[in-house]
């Protein structure tokens, strides 16, 4: 007797899922420019969280750190170790870049799971983690490519381009293609993982709106942190590779 009500409930859940549209966006028209408002809003929130946390934690620095200052010093030490492991002894100038990438992506990813973006109603689309949008991930990957070339040219000058014909000139097209695929792989990997994680949670909440999605949400938090670490590690590895000249 309970089969029909359960079936109706399941169909209703599937109908709700069909209403989830990934491609809807809210745009701001500024002159001739069309600005993707959702990404800007959520990115500003993430930046405000990062800046606010740092200002509060280190507004009264102590010789013996404690509390928030101790936490951020631990984070800085972690980023230094990561940069040194991938880049080598010349890692110092790249710590701010790698740290900025890691912290922004980490907080952006976690904001998708922890902040109630859905409460804010928009005329079109809905708010989500900044890294849930391909525009953000590409915008993060492109500076990594610029840093990659800058590091190589700064270290080796025009001799940097010799790597494209090593070990044989026949590999020139493949070596050039490799440099173009690096930012693509960084951006699509991050975008795909964060989007998939949020969609899985939406589907489970629509079908089983109880405690079942909670383990998936915790798994999403873990995956989000790993994705930030992977992005920062690969960015540092690419920079180190361009400076050392080995593959």
UniProtKB/Swiss-Prot annotation:
Q: Which CDD domains match?
A: ATP-synt_Fo_a_6
User: Its topology with respect to the membrane?
Assistant: Multi-pass membrane protein
A GO molecular function term, named singly, is:
proton-transporting ATP synthase activity, rotational mechanism
Question: InterPro entries from the entry?
Answer: ATP_syn_F0_a_bact/chloroplast (IPR045082), ATP_synth_F0_asu (IPR000568), ATP_synth_F0_asu_AS (IPR023011), F0_ATP_A_sf (IPR035908)
Coiled-coil region(s) at which residues? none
- What keyword terms does UniProt attach to this protein? ATP synthesis, CF(0), Chloroplast, Hydrogen ion transport, Ion transport, Membrane, Plastid, Thylakoid, Transmembrane, Transmembrane helix, Transport
Mind telling me which Pfam families this protein's record contains? ATP-synt_A
Name assigned to this protein: ATP synthase subunit a, chloroplastic
List the top taxonomic levels of the source.
Answer: Eukaryota, Viridiplantae, Streptophyta, Embryophyta, Tracheophyta
Gene this chain is encoded by: atpI
